[in-house]
Amino acid sequence: ARYVHVDWNDTPLQRARLQYSQPDDLDFFPEFEVQRHRQMVDEQWARLALVGPEFPDLLNDVDPVAMRRVSQVRIQKLRFYMQAQMANQLQWCVAAVPTPAWAQKVFPHLAADEAVARLWDVILHTVRADLPDPVAAWRRHDEQLQRVTRFLAHNQVQSLHFFDPTPGADGKPASDLHVGLTDHSLWLAASSLTPEGIRFLPNMPTEEVFSAPHNQRTTGYVRTSRPCFPLERRVEGAYFRFEAGEIVAYDA
C-alpha cells in the first residue's frame, strides 16, 4: 500500500464523551472527518475493519438517547461515504479479531489467554485460513454461493419463511415469520465487484445469500436467539411482530 491510515475506536473514550458532554455538543462532528472521508471516496481507498469488543458491556448503562444522537449525526455527515461503500465504489472488508473480554464470553470456562487462543482457532477456521490454499478455498466457496443465488433467481422465490419451533415464554414457536419478496427479486452473495471489475469480499467469514423484501409483505413475528449489540449495547430476547410489512409490536 502507498499509505495506511489507522483509525482506532476506543470504547472508554466513547463512554466518557456520552457521559460528560453537554447535550448540544453531542451534535458536533468535525469537518476534517468529512473531508477525509470525501478524499477516501474520490481516491477509492480500500478499507479493512478489524472488529472485536474490548469492553463488551461498557455502554450498557449509557443513555441510549445520547448514543443514538451521536450515531445519527455521524450517519448524516458521512452518508455519501456509506453510499459509495454500499455501491461497491470502494473495496472494503470486515473481519473479527479476538479480545480477552469477548473470548471469555464465548469460552467462560477458560482462562483469558486460553480463551483468546481458542477463539483465534475458531476464527481462522471459519475464514479458511487454516487450509493449504485459503485463496483457492474462498474462490470455491464464493462460486458455490453464487450458484445458490442463480438457483433462487431462476426459481423466482416469492417469500421466505423463518420458523423456530423452540417454545417461547407463551408456549408458541419462538419465531414464525413470512417475508414476502418483490415480484422480480434479485439475489446477491459473498463477493462484490467494483465499477472497475475488481472482485472483493466485504465480509469474512460470509455464508449468507440475500435479497430485499417487499415493503408490505412481511407478516408474523421473530425473536432473536442470540444476544445482539445495537449501538454497542447488549440486547437479548428481542421480539418484533409484523403486519403488512410494518412493525406493530416489539419487546426485549
Predicted feature locations:
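Conserved AWS/pre-SET-to-SET junction and N-terminal core of the SET lysine methyltransferase domain
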Residues: 201-239
